[in-house]
Amino acid sequence: MATLIRSKLSNVATSVSNKSQAKVSGMFARMGFQAATDEEALGFAHCDDLDMEHRQGLQMDILKTEVPSGDPTAEGDSHYQRDGTGPPSSASKDEGLCSELSSYGKPKITAWEAGWNVTNAIQGMFVLGLPYAILHGGYLGLFLIIFAAVVCCYTGKILIACLYEENEDGETVRVRDSYVDIANACCAPRFPKLGGRVVNVAQIIELVMTCILYVVVSGNLMYNSFPSLPISQKSWSIIATAMLLPCAFLKNLKAVSKFSLLCTLAHFVINVLVIAYCLSRARDWAWDKVKFYIDVKKFPISIGIIVFSYTSQIFLPSLEGNMQSPKEFHCMMNWTHIAACILKGLFALVAYLTWADETKEVITDNLPSTIRAVVNLFLVAKALLSYPLPFFAAVEVLEKSLFQEGARAFFPNCYGGDGRLKSWGLTLRCALVVFTLLMAIYVPHFALLMGLTGSLTGAGLCFLLPSLFHLKLLWRKLQWHQVFFDVSIFVIGSICSVSGFVHSLEGLIEAFRFNIED
């Protein structure tokens, strides 16, 4: 009897407890919370993890590792995949962890080595067009060289800031790997691929135009070095392109990279020779020719030339990711752009003071014939050795975006199962080399082409997109002065980009109409 009473009391207590828990759970549910037992808590925690991964997968890009066998899951990756299909499987997570751990063993570059790479990008051959920018801009052109250095340094920093986000513990972690990843994150979730495609198109245009400029400058330099020879500038461009055809067979840049240091040293020697010659004529410098006013029609072209000479944002995310100490990135950007600003300003001013209104689009064309031939031969060698770098980068972007996206690719893979380049893939590479030749033949205007490229893609990749992405991704964390800087850069960059593009086109049309040769 006592046992029966005890069991009934226990049942009543249990039912009361269940009802009270149900009421409390209902109350919490109406407030937006959910009560759970210990066993259910594990399930809810797992669901929360999956939900968090899914939401992050909508916003972040996923790196897919493809293997020749065609099995996309054979090699995993701990990063998010590009197509936003959700988190990888547990097997791929384990393999991705192994790949992450193995990546720690890869050699990293120091801040000095990173600075050397940035210096090579912003102190290349295209500084030869800066005196021409001073010709049409005067002192305002000199100010623009300084201003462009400050802005490009700032936009490079904010572009890298877009690679990072704070986790739940308040720690800043790197969640993106490239310029394309940042663009896709800004357009997600509605258009997760749009931003990356825009950036890819801009990169391809800039890289191909860089290749065209190398062919143009090679033909220009050879023609002006040997004017007595019965060979036109177009013929010299064809000869230069014939030497560049082996670039179509490139599988990697190991062979080319061996010449990078030699190219940089040669260019440094050339700059020293030009400045030394200019200093030898310091008594004849035409200070009165440096204008305080600008040529309204041609100054926007100068803006494009100056901006194009500072472009390095394309490879900054990869460079920062390979640094031993990413914290030193800001310091590295500061001293590289300060050095570039000083050297470019001095080179442009000294060269313009020497030749004043006779300054040509490529400043070495103003040198005496004896010195010009030697200097130009070095420059042509540097241009030909520099051509494979942007060419290979453009080929990689084209192959990844058009030929290597699996089922979503527009065209079949240009590589066979054994990794060899197919014949039609080789034909496309040769066609790209020939395209750069045709553009160089029919548009042989170095400064106008450089101004056009700088206004179109240079301003977009260096000014407009970094400031726009910074506002989009980090809006809630930005202070008022950062918002002001970003908006100002975007507005000024848009105005300069449109005006430079329009005036560069007008300059090209005028050159064709009156058959003006460089």
Swiss-Prot record:
GO MF term (any one): gamma-aminobutyric acid transmembrane transporter activity
Function of the protein: Antiporter that exchanges vesicular protons for cytosolic 4-aminobutanoate or to a lesser extend glycine, thus allowing their secretion from nerve terminals. The transport is equally dependent on the chemical and electrical components of the proton gradient. May also transport beta-alanine. Acidification of GABAergic synaptic vesicles is a prerequisite for 4-aminobutanoate uptake.
Topological domain ranges for the Cytoplasmic compartment: 1-125, 219-258, 320-334, 398-431, 476-482
Pfam families in the cross-refs: Aa_trans
Keyword DNA-binding attached: no
Family: Belongs to the amino acid/polyamine transporter 2 family.
Subcellular location: Cytoplasmic vesicle membrane; Presynapse
Main subcellular location of this protein, as a coarse class: membrane
Catalytic activity: 4-aminobutanoate(out) + n H(+)(in) = 4-aminobutanoate(in) + n H(+)(out); glycine(out) + n H(+)(in) = glycine(in) + n H(+)(out); beta-alanine(out) + n H(+)(in) = beta-alanine(in) + n H(+)(out)
Gene designation: slc32a1
Membrane topology term: Multi-pass membrane protein
Residue spans crossing the bilayer: 126-146, 198-218, 259-279, 299-319, 335-355, 377-397, 432-452, 455-475, 483-503
Alphabetical list of InterPro entries matching this protein: AA_transpt_TM
Protein name: Vesicular inhibitory amino acid transporter
Lumenal, vesicle side, ranges: 147-197, 280-298, 356-376, 453-454, 504-518
GO biological process, any: glycine transport
